[in-house]
């Protein structure tokens, strides 16, 4: 799987992701895979994903096809974007939205974190959009990343970027589906 992290501190937001791809017990590190990034620039912000590797292609193709990139300005704005993205995933990219018969709505089958000038956000696979005040993480190493963020966040010497990198590194240390190096991007908050 993956570990993705978003952090807000001061006037900076940071989004970080590991670079390991894994298929069962097979691990493919950034040393062997040229297109290993799990992050992409969208408008004035950045998006990171965890889930199937094809999610990166879907996101890049979908956002690249828009005349105007989304602003990612609020949970409602992001939800409206994700409704259209989900339809495109099914129609253009042949997404199989069936995860579990007990689900009340179809799944997009990947989770996303967003850093934009308006703040930091998460979108779950069932399109629940949350705005975070400090930090969050998704993926197989999320519990390690969240623990590191909780322990380090109040250190005045650490920026949002430093925290995000340390959180993914902590996940890589303890989670077999998370690997270094870390890709990290920052955004200046409004």
Q: Which residues fall in each region the model found?
A:
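Conserved short S/T/G-enriched processing/targeting/catalytic segments and their helical context
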Residues: 1-100, 105, 129-161, 178-188
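Adenine-nucleotide phosphate-binding core of ATP-dependent small-molecule kinases
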Residues: 111
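N-terminal glycine-/lysine-enriched basic segments
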Residues: 114
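Small-residue (G/A/S/T)-rich helix-start motifs and N-terminal tracts that mark the onset
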Residues: 161-169
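Oxyanion-binding and handling regions
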Residues: 173, 187-190
């Amino acid at each position: 799987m993956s570990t993705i992290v978003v952090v807000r501190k001061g006037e900076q937001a940071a989004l970080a992701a590991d670079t390991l791809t894994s298929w069962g017990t097979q691990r493919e590190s950034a040393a062997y895979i040229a297109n290993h990034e799990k992050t992409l620039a969208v408008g004035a912000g950045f998006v990171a994903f965890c889930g199937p590797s094809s999610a990166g292609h879907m996101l890049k193709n979908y956002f690249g096809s828009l005349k105007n990139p989304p602003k990612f300005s609020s949970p409602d704005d992001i939800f409206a974007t994700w409704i259209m993205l989900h339809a495109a995933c099914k129609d253009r990219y042949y997404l199989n939205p069936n995860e579990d018969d007990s689900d009340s709505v179809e799944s997009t089958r990947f989770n996303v974190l967003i850093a934009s000038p308006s703040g930091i956000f998460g979108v779950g696979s069932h399109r629940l959009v949350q705005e975070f005040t400090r930090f969050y993480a998704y993926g197989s190493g999320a519990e390690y990343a969240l623990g590191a963020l909780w322990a380090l966040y109040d250190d005045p010497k650490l920026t949002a970027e430093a925290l995000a990198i340390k959180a993914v590194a902590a996940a890589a240390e303890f989670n077999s589906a998370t690997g270094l190096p870390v890709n990290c991007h920052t955004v200046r908050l409004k």
